[in-house]
């Protein structure tokens, strides 16, 4: 069976690594266009991302964090959303504070009027400004902040070492389907690629669904624009979302 993944990026290269590991006896082709620029913004994950790449034999979590300059993300702090001066911290993943000998009834009676971070390891880390790992990474289940470009480069380098992954640098110009609408082949500038299963990792381009019915939620999205910029500051393990009169930052 031949899998065709259209689009590089984190989703494309990670799909190639996961599928080719889970189903190593199949053929995998990934098409990436040099005409499409990488969006140079930060990315955030959940702890499930780390658990996922841990299962890949050619990826070491410590190496991944070092090469991509990733930093821990233990939660999101919402400021002023319930009134000026209010704060709510939402931990992302992290183990609950558990003890088999602890009387859970008394414990939950205590925290019933407390915030979520009372029962979360990440809530404690946030209050103490501590990192969720030491020199040796073990049972690392924290979310991460990622550098998008560095992460793509890392995943791509690992993918290209797999013998069952073929890389094609080309630009898709047309999608050919059968009478039922199933994709049969992809016409590129310099290649025609056929396959059995096609995976769309083209992001906003949505090349496989561009002609599908579209349901707009524009009227339900009062905040429909964003301005991005970078600034120098100490690395934080918490994403802050401060409510403003118009929108948030």
Annotate the PLM regions.
Residues 28-33, 133-140:
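A short, surface-exposed helix-loop junction/capping segment
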Residues 1-9:
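Beta1/beta-strand and adjacent pyrophosphate-binding region of the FAD-binding site
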Residues 4, 27-29, 166:
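A structural signal for isolated positions on well-ordered beta-strands in alpha/beta enzyme cores
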Residues 140-249:
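Predominantly flavin-linked oxidoreductase catalytic cores and closely associated redox partners
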Residues 37, 41-127:
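Dinucleotide-binding Rossmann-like beta1-alpha1 core, especially the glycine-rich loop
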Residues 20-41:
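Glycine-rich FAD pyrophosphate-binding loop
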Residues 12-13:
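N-terminal Rossmann-fold NAD(P) dinucleotide-binding loop
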